[in-house]
């Protein structure tokens, strides 16, 4: 029984173990299934991504359009990478590590600099020798403009002996027709040869000069060459008969000079009308240079200041510049010719200068020269030089104009291979006449405004032209608005000389535009001529006016020095045909702007030979000064006066010069009309001719008491030797002179009064102390002449001639200042002035006295007039 129970227990345990094992297996299967599903998903994702990459890589492989399996794609990719690795290794071996091009330069600028450094230029030639492109660097090297070479045959610029060799070199690739494929053109086919090229000249008649050059280049296949006409004519071969690559193959070369140039001519103008300003001395040395000059000429201002402009000019231009500068010094302004200026980079640049002379604002003397320099191109220079030489483009040629733009694609003209071969077979070496004709025509003047290209026809080849092509070329030329030229050409034999073709070519349109430009230039020249003539007339008028003033000053000096009394301004100079004249005492009274010499008479001792004098005019200047002395304000104002001089009667009587003389009964009266109650001193000036130089003239305000002869004349003086005047009484001064020989009595104009300066005391000062106005001798006058010049701008005087020589007591308180009176043994001329300040009251008086034969009666008569003013009233 125990065994049975144990067996039963063991069976139950076994069943229980089997169930647990099954459950565990189920769980493990579930886990494995989940893992497998997850792994399958990731594997599928990886395969999909791999297929996508293989497909993309297969699409990038060239050559096969069919579908490739994965292994093929991978194999070709491996081959490409291997080849690329080899190419990279080769490139790294031949690569130059140094960076040649600076970062601040563009490709065009760097190319231009490299060409200048190599003394070379780019040239593109078709297989037949037609030039389709040339760089601008050809101008400083060969003196050709790019427009002179484009669309021309290269054989026109090569000596005849080298034509066949050059043509064989250019056509050498034609022998290998099998290899003439785009792949061959892209491969290495470098070609080098040397030859001579013609240098350009301004005058086509000059002897041709050739430069030895070297061509280094290769053939290129151009895909963008337009199917344009060659020299304005369409080819005769149909386009279908030509190879597809024929007119798109050209020889691109770098042409270098065998002998480098140390100083080159820089003719490329980057920006038109570039200019800068400078200032020069009259010796043409730099005084100033503005900020625009360094980018153009390379010099900084401090590098050229003080140097002569002639140090920078070309030796061939010195003669023309010297003539231009002479014209500048003659006319004051002008325009220079075209000349070459040496820059700091040792290159010649063409300039034209407009200059003018500036003058000092005070003395009008030439100070310096202001110049405005403008940069010009070689095309303008050559056109101007040819116009000066009178060269006209009259040779038989057909011109077609094109507009060239550096930023646009170059217009390339081609010709068929058959035409080139015919030309080579017919005339491999053009004649001398043909070459000279081409030489004279390839340097045609180009219009710088539209930059047209001059195209000519090779005269050794019969031109071919259709009507439609002629119409197209005519429309193209008219649309470009350049020189309108059309021509007709007739078939000529190939062997016919070039000089026989002018009859076959005719100009059909007039040169309207050049005529218009010439008219505009002629009008500008005429306008400039009119301005110069007007300026010349103004300068001549100024010179005449200055000469007239100088003549007047010379006459004034002659009057002062006694070399002849002549008046240049004024209606008349009165003359007295008496030798001995004495002027009587003068009576002054107040007046306004008008004073009349009603009757000024000069009577001789015997009362005979009276001659009337013509009236003269005299004007004064206005001088205002205010002086206050002893509480009295006296305004010294000299207003303009018009003095009418009436007929004068002359008389003379002579006395000894050593005695004190008095007037001999001669009189002159002044009649004035008072219009304003203004206190104005009158300046009366007398011109006196004296035969000797030792005379002293005194104008006393108080006469000496010890003079017995004039005892009656001082009865009104007080003990303190002061003259007393009443409120309404006028001031009377007696002037006594000695009889002298006088040839003329003159009332000069005010222009001479600048040489006379006097010192005037006020009326208050005259009442305090006696005054004597002596004229010092020559030594004292010269010492005080400097004081006279300072006062002559403040006072203006008038003069009346009168001989005088009193000998009175001298009181050196105040002196009468004169200029240039007594000089050596010459006849002295004395200008006296006496100013008498009047009280601020109106005096309306006129005096007329009778001639007294004796001195006592005259003195008594003068005393009565001073004491009793009623006697001085006009009768």
Curated annotation (Swiss-Prot):
Residues 420-507, 628-674, 794-813, 842-875 are annotated as: Disordered. Induction: Expressed in a circadian rhythm manner in the retina. Levels increase over daylight hours, reaching maximum levels between ZT12 and ZT18. Expression levels continue to oscillate during constant darkness, with levels increasing during subjective day to reach maximum levels between day/night transition. In the pineal gland, shows no robust circadian rhythm with only a slight increase in expression between ZT10-18. This is Circadian locomoter output cycles protein kaput. It comes from Gallus gallus (Chicken). One of its GO terms (biological process) is circadian regulation of gene expression. The record marks 39, 43, 47 as: Interaction with E-box DNA. One of its GO terms (molecular function) is RNA polymerase II cis-regulatory region sequence-specific DNA binding. The keyword Disulfide bond does not apply. Transcriptional activator which forms a core component of the circadian clock. The circadian clock, an internal time-keeping system, regulates various physiological processes through the generation of approximately 24 hour circadian rhythms in gene expression, which are translated into rhythms in metabolism and behavior. It is derived from the Latin roots 'circa' (about) and 'diem' (day) and acts as an important regulator of a wide array of physiological functions including metabolism, sleep, body temperature, blood pressure, endocrine, immune, cardiovascular, and renal function. Expressed in the retinal photoreceptor cells (at protein level). Isoform 1 is expressed in both the retina and pineal gland. Isoform 2 is expressed mainly in the pineal gland. PROSITE patterns: BHLH, PAS. Residues 516-566 are annotated as: Implicated in the circadian rhythmicity. It comes from the Eukaryota. The modification Phosphothreonine is found at residues 451, 461. The gene is CLOCK. A motif (Nuclear localization signal) lies at residues 32-47. It is found in: Cytoplasm; Nucleus; Cytoplasm, Cytosol.
């Amino acid at each position: 029984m125990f065994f049975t129970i144990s067996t039963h227990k063991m069976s139950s345990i076994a069943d229980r173990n089997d169930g647990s094992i099954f459950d565990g297996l189920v769980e493990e299967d579930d886990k494995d299934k989940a893992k497998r599903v997850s792994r399958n998903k990731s594997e599928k994702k990886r395969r999909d991504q791999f297929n996508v990459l293989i497909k993309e890589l297969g699409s990038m492989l060239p050559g096969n359009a069919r579908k490739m399996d994965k292994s093929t794609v991978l194999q070709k990719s491996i081959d490409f990478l291997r080849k690329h690795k080899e190419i990279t290794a080769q490139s790294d071996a031949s690569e130059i590590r140094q960076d040649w091009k600076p970062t601040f330069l563009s490709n065009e600028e760097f190319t231009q600099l490299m060409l200048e450094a190599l003394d070379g230029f780019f040239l593109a030639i078709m297989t037949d020798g037609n030039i389709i492109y040339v760089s601008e660097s050809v101008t400083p090297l060969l003196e050709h403009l790019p427009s002179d070479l484009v669309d021309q045959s290269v054989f026109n610029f090569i000596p005849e002996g080298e034509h066949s060799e050059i043509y064989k070199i250019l056509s050498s690739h034609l022998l290998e027709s099998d290899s003439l494929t785009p792949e061959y053109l892209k491969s290495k086919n470098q070609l080098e040869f040397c030859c001579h090229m013609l240098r350009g000249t301004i005058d086509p008649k000059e002897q041709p000069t050739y430069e030895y050059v070297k061509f280094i280049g290769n053939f290129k296949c151009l895909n963008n060459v337009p199917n344009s006409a060659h020299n304005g004519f369409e080819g005769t071969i149909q386009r279908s008969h030509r190879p597809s690559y024929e007119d798109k193959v050209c020889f691109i070369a770098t042409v270098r000079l065998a002998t480098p140039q140390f100083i080159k001519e820089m003719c490329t103008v980057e920006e038109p009308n570039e200019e800068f300003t400078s200032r020069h001395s009259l010796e043409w040395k730099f005084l100033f240079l503005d900020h625009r000059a360094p980018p153009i000429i390379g010099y900084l201002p401090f590098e050229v200041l003080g140097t002569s402009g002639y140090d920078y000019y070309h030796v061939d231009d010195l003669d023309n510049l010297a003539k231009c500068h002479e014209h500048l010094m003659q006319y004051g302004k002008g325009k220079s010719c075209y000349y070459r200026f040496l820059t700091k980079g040792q290159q010649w640049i063409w300039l034209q200068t407009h200059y003018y002379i500036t003058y000092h604002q005070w003395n009008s003397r030439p100070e310096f020269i202001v110049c405005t320099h403008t940069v010009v191109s070689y095309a303008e220079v050559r056109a101007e030089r040819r116009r000066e030489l009178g060269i006209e483009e009259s040779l038989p040629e057909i011109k077609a104009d094109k507009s060239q733009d550096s930023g646009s694609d170059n217009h390339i003209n081609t010709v068929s291979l058959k035409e080139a071969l015919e030309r080579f077979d017919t005339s491999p070496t053009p004649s001398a006449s043909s070459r000279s004709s081409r030489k004279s025509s390839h340097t045609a003047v180009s219009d710088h405004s539209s930059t047209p290209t001059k195209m000519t026809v090779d005269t050794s080849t019969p031109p071919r032209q259709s009507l439609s092509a002629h119409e197209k070329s005519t429309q193209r030329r008219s649309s470009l608005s350049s020189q309108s030229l059309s021509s007709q050409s007739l078939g000529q034999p190939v062997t016919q000389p070039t000089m026989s073709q002018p009859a076959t070519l005719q100009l059909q349109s007039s040169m309207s535009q050049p005529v218009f430009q010439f008219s505009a230039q002629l009008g500008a020249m005429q306008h400039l001529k009119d301005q110069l003539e007007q300026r010349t007339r103004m300068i001549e008028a100024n010179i005449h006016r200055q000469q007239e003033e100088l003549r007047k000053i010379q006459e004034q000096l002659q009057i002062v020095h006694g070399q002849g009394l002549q008046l240049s301004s004024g209606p008349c100079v009165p003359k007295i045909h008496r030798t001995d004249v004495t002027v009587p005492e003068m009576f002054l009274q107040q007046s306004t702007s008008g004073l009349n010499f009603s009757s000024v008479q000069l009577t001789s001792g015997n009362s005979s030979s009276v001659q009337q004098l013509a009236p003269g005019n005299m004007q004064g200047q206005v001088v205002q000064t205010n002086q206050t002395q002893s509480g009295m304000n006296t305004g010294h104002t000299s207003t303009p006066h018009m003095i009418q001089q009436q007929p004068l009667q002359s008389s003379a009587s002579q006395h000894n010069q050593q005695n004190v003389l008095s007037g001999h009964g001669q009189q002159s009266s002044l009649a004035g009309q008072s219009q304003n109650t203004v206190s104005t001193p009158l300046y009366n000036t007398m011109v006196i001719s004296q035969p000797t130089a030792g005379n002293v003239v005194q104008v006393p305000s108080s006469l000496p008491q010890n003079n017995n002869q004039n005892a009656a004349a001082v009865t009104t003086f007080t003990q303190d030797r002061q003259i007393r005047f009443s409120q309404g009484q006028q001031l009377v001064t007696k002037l006594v002179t000695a009889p002298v020989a006088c040839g003329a009595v003159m009332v000069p104009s005010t222009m001479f009064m600048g040489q006379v300066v006097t010192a005037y005391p006020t009326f208050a000062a005259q009442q305090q102390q006696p005054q004597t106005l002596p004229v010092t001798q020559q030594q004292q006058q010269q010492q005080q002449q400097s004081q006279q010049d300072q006062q002559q701008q403040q006072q203006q005087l008038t003069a009346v001639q009168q001989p005088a020589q009193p000998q009175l007591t001298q009181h050196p308180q105040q002196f009468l200042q004169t200029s240039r009176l007594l000089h050596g043994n010459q006849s002295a001329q004395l200008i006296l002035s006496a100013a008498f300040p009047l009280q601020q009251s109106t005096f309306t008086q006129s005096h007329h006295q009778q001639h007294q034969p004796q001195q006592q009666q005259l003195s008594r008569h003068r005393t009565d007039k001073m004491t009793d003013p009623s006697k001085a009233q006009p009768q």
